């Protein structure tokens, strides 16, 4: 891994100052840097400046609000989220997702904002400079073709974040600040299906906080599969939230990660009102298969990753159904 190239560092004290600093060209936000800095060492980007967000007061705060909702600053560490008593009790899917990221050392530093906004990944992209140059680079960075689908005019690098799908099924919203002020969007709207430009943040915008509503009658869980449990990104990850009314599915949300260029909600309206049985599980598998787009973006085979995604989709809903 190469040494870092030269860049300036700004350390603003307020969100407003951070937004102003990010308005400059070739400037990137920096949280803990557990994803960004290794990529820069590989030559994946050459920013003129990094805006260090760790000095902004209150950005790491986790609090429950008067209406029972949860507010998490984008600077909160994954360790703090995973170990927070209220989150473990009321929003366990979020704690599960945070606790499943990488290893303990990573979680002690890595932030919520960084995990949500992490770069997409691909076996043709996450390589050294000499490896990529010998392969003619790729459409995501410096090249003119996607090696995953050669004739495509878009990048198919895959999003592998764990926390996003959990927040999506919990109906969480993202608070974004930027030159035009503040806006709030559903977490799913932070992303688009484009490996090269998977975030919808505009120039100068940054993620400030996440708000999660009270769970009410919903229960939720997150599960993933990876090669090495200690550190690896998910080959496939699934979050689900369920409302059960007797033997009837009163509400269901399912979100997937590790399969597409963005974490995606699976349209599951066809299952509402029915029982959760083998037929329903097969319907869910078909819906997940239709939503997902597993390609050769990792060294693990496509067929295996697809089978794992379908299997854990059923597993998560099975667990929620049996627990209610």
Curated annotation (Swiss-Prot):
Residues 2-217 form the FAD-binding PCMH-type domain. Component of a complex that catalyzes the reductive dehydroxylation of 4-hydroxybenzoyl-CoA to benzoyl-CoA. Reaction is not reversible. Is a key enzyme in the anaerobic degradation of phenolic compounds. GO terms for molecular function: 4 iron, 4 sulfur cluster binding; 4-hydroxybenzoyl-CoA reductase activity; FAD binding; metal ion binding. The keyword Metal-binding applies. Its cofactor is FAD; [4Fe-4S] cluster. The lineage of its organism: Bacteria, Pseudomonadati, Pseudomonadota, Betaproteobacteria, Rhodocyclales. Inactivated by low concentrations of cyanide in vitro. Binds 1 FAD per subunit. Its EC number is 1.1.7.1. It holds the Pfam family CO_deh_flav_C. InterPro entries: 4hydrxbenzoyl-CoA_Rdtase_bsu, CO_DH_flav_C, CO_DH_flav_C_dom_sf, Diverse_Substr_Oxidored, FAD-bd_PCMH, FAD-bd_PCMH-like_sf, FAD-bd_PCMH_sub1, FAD-bd_PCMH_sub2. Keywords: 4Fe-4S, FAD, Flavoprotein, Iron, Iron-sulfur, Metal-binding, Oxidoreductase. Heterohexamer of two alpha, two beta and two gamma subunits. It catalyses: oxidized 2[4Fe-4S]-[ferredoxin] + benzoyl-CoA + H2O = 4-hydroxybenzoyl-CoA + reduced 2[4Fe-4S]-[ferredoxin] + 2 H(+). NCBIfam families: 4hydrxCoA_B (TIGR03195). It is an enzyme of class 1 (oxidoreductase). This is 4-hydroxybenzoyl-CoA reductase subunit beta. [4Fe-4S] cluster binds at residues 122, 138, 146, 155. FAD binds at residues 29-36, 111, 115, 118, 162, 224.
């Amino acid at each position: 891994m190469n040494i870092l190239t030269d860049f300036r560092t700004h350390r603003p004290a307020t969100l407003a100052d951070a937004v102003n600093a990010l308005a400059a060209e070739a400037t990137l936000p920096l949280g803990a840097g557990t994803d960004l800095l290794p990529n820069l060492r590989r030559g994946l980007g050459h920013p003129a400046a990094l805006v260090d967000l760790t000095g902004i007061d209150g950005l790491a705060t986790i609090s429950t609000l008067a209406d029972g909702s949860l507010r998490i600053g984008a600077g909160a560490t994954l360790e703090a989220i995973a170990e927070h008593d209220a989150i473990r009790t009321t929003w366990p899917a979020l704690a599960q997702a945070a606790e499943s990221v990488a290893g303990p050392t990573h979680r002690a530093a890595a932030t919520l904002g960084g995990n949500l906004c992490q770069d997409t990944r691909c076996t043709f992209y996450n390589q050294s400079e000499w490896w990529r140059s010998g392969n003619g680079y790729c459409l995501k960075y410096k090249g003119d073709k996607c090696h995953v689908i050669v004739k495509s005019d878009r990048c198919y690098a895959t999003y592998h974040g764990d926390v996003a799908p959990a927040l999506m099924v919990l109906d969480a919203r993202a608070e974004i600040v930027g030159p035009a002020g503040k806006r709030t969007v559903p977490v799913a709207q932070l992303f688009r299906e484009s490996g090269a430009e998977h975030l919808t943040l505009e120039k100068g915008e940054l993620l400030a906080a996440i708000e999660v509503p009270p769970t009410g009658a919903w229960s939720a869980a997150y599960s993933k599969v990876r090669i090495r449990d200690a550190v690896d990104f998910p080959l496939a990850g699934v979050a689900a939230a369920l409302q059960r009314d007797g033997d009837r599915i009163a509400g269901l949300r399912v979100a997937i990660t590790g399969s597409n260029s963005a974490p995606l909600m699976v349209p599951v309206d066809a299952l509402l009102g029915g029982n959760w049985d083998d037929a329903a599980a097969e319907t869910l598998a078909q819906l997940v298969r239709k939503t997902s787009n597993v390609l050769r973006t990792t060294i693990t085979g496509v067929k295996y990753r697809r089978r794992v995604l379908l299997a854990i989709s059923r597993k998560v809903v099975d667990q929620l159904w049996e627990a209610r």
